[in-house]
Amino acid sequence: LAMKGYAVLAIDPVSQGERLQFLDFPEFKGSCCWEHNVMGKQLLLTGETMGAWRAWDAVRGLDYLLSRPEVDTTRVGLTGNSGGGTMTTFVNALEDRLTMAAPSCYITTWVHNVENELPADSEQMPPGTLAAGLEMGDFLIARAPRPLVVLGQSNDFFDPRGTRETYEEVRKVYRLLGAEDSIRLTIGHGDHGYSKENREAMYSLF
């Protein structure tokens, strides 16, 4: 994105990159998922959630980004892969300052996650979600008809069948709002990751 001329802010959310928390535990090395779940359990004991902390990181990052004079505040997109896709999904629902979003390798359905026995990181399912009858798509519907591209991979553990199902459900709402052209789906032909094919789909939206 930066090479294409965009102003870009890439944050290290808590428990990733330079913000790893458990440096004295070699068994956590190489996998941020361990950290997410250990810290997530600690936060639950205090009435907090890992997802809320990570979302707040993104919100405060957005505060800073929009304070920069070179940033066009009328065109602000959010994207990320895996944990970044999770963050994009939830922050997109929360933030009215965003104008487009591209979650990658997170969107599927809760049912597919259960059927595939997919272990989830602490932040991936906000407490009360299932009790409220919410699906992943509901977090995308919350900001319809904001321009959106849903990205997945054919060999991802976030089941691409669920990705397609969610996309179709969300697209119905966009259609009702007269904005079907504002939502897109790209399923790449690879494993869990932000492939060139998917990045190109995101560039075309942004």
What is each stretch, according to the model?
Residues 144, 151-206:
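Alpha/beta-hydrolase-fold serine-hydrolase catalytic core, especially in secreted/extracellular enzymes
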Residues 4-7, 72-75, 96-100, 144-148, ...:
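Loop/turn elements at helix/coil->beta-strand transitions in domains of secreted/extracellular proteins
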Residues 37-45, 53, 57-60, 99-141, ...:
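Mobile cap/lid helix-loop segments that gate and shape the active-site cleft of serine hydrolases
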Residues 1-59, 66-67, 73, 108-117:
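Cap/lid segment of the alpha/beta-hydrolase catalytic domain
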Residues 70-82:
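Alpha/beta-hydrolase fold nucleophile elbow
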Residues 12, 79, 104-105, 151, ...:
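Alpha/beta-hydrolase-fold catalytic nucleophile elbow
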Residues 80-92:
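Glycine-rich nucleophile elbow surrounding the catalytic serine of serine-hydrolase chemistry
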Residues 16-20, 85-88, 108-113, 140, ...:
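Flexible loop/turn segments at secondary-structure boundaries
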